[in-house]
Amino acid sequence: MTGTSIRALAVATLLAGLTAGSVRAEEATINIDNFAFTPAETTVKAGTKVRFVNHDDIPHTIVLANGKVRSKALDTDDSFAFVFDKPGEFVYFCGLHPHMKGEVKVTP
């Protein structure tokens, strides 16, 4: 391999790594513990995956108040993820325990 080929390969490898890193989506986690979502209010950028993780000993669900998302019942240590791809304020609650509420604010 010539010096030019090695340099071209090195540049291509570097650019491939940068591209892969920039494509990676953001992720946020909301924990469910003691019949509460923590944090109860979360602000993320559009395109962020939000993962809800149940740490309680009983099942919980995630339901968006607009009715567009409803998870299955999450047992202990189960999780549910959803990508918030549009800006707005999204109120959610547990369908099994409606007093459990939270909000995800999505910025552009």
Where are these regions (language model features)?
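Extracytoplasmic copper-binding redox domains, predominantly the cupredoxin/blue-copper superfamily
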Residues: 2-6, 17, 21-108
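Cleavable N-terminal signal peptides
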Residues: 11-12, 23
